[in-house]
Amino acid sequence: MPSTQHDALVWLSGSAYDVVFDMARSIIRDIAGEASLGEETSSWSYRHDRDLTGFIDGSENPALLDAPAAALFPEGVAGAAGSVLLLQKWQHKAAEWEALPIDRQERIMGRTKIDSIELENKPVNSHVARTDQDEFGKIFRRNMPYGTVHDHGTMFVGFSADQKRLSRMLESMAGLVTGTRDALTHFTQPLTGSYYFVPSVESLRRLR
């Protein structure tokens, strides 16, 4: 999988695109002369909680009350209340994916398409099986669709209290753990990949 590391990441999120757009331009102006923009991607919500495969995304996310334990460094360690972020841009092979019958898509995902119920006899190469959080550890995802009608996919946005959880999931998807590759990766291609440390709000306040 590609490594396209940059020095820093700015992630803006909001329901009003014009406000987000103006904030982004303001940030770019503020850092002019100190840093340059290496890459920019705009995303949006699609059918409430689905990605552009048509499946519900984030079904395995912990509940909001449990999310801090999965995503944030514990107190007493360096970077406490911060998180490791894995950011990847996955370009979908939409025509190939949409040509598959729904039951085939469900076996690739390991879940039903309408209500995201995990299949009892899911294939070992299904996406759910290759990224089993009960095996690798819990993470918190905030994935978003991106792109145009002709070129689109998923921005993977994964937060974890332990970078190894994320790296082991990637190794499993690529088939480096057992030799079994994630079937979903035949229909979506990673274009970028980078890790960032996200400090706590309190840590950022102390920088002022």
Predicted ranges, named:
Residues 1-208:
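Long, histidine/aromatic-enriched segments associated with O2/redox biology
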